[in-house]
Amino acid sequence: YQRFQKDRRRTAKAAAVWLDALEAYRLRLRQLKVLDPACGSGAFLIQALELLKREQRWVAEEVLRITGQAEVWDMDDVVNDILASNLYGVDINAESLEIAKLALWMHTATPGRPLSRLDDNLRCGNSLVGPDFYQQHQRELFSKAEQERINVFDWQAAFPAVIAQGGFDCIVSNPPYVKLQNFRRVFGSA
C-alpha cells in the first residue's frame, strides 16, 4: 500500500509538471509571431494557421488526457486569436494581398460569425526596401510611377508592437523569384 501511495504521489507530481509545461507551451504558441514577407495569395500563412490550430488542439487533448476534464474552449475563438496575434504578411502587390485575405477568410469562415479583421496584420509594401531607401537615393530621381512601384515598407510603422517585442519569431516564404535585371533597372548597378 505504501508503495502504491508513493507511486501515486510521484504520478501526481509528474502530471502537475507536465500540465505546467503544457500551459507554458500554450502561452508561447499564443505569443508566436509568424511572418511571410512575400505572402502572395497566403498559402504559407494558411499552413501556419493550420499548424498553430493543431498545436492548440493537441495541448487541449493532453490536458484532457491528464486531468480527465475537457477544457471549455472554442476553436473559432482560437482561430480568431491566431489571425489577430500570430500571423503577419507583407506583399508588394495589393491584389495578391487581397487574395491572401480572401483565402484566409474562406479557410476560417464560420456561419453566424463575423469575418476576422486582417488589415492590421496583412500589409502592402516592398518588404525588401525600407524607408531609408530615399535617404540613400534622391527621391526626385524617380518618377511618381517608379516610387509607387518601389513601394517602400516601414516595418516599425506597420508592426510597432511586434517590433517593440523584439520582432518576428518565424519567417516563412518562398525565395524571391525575380530577375536581377529588374533590380538593376530600378536600383542601378550598385
Where are these regions (language model features)?
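SAM-dependent methyltransferase catalytic region
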Residues: 1-190
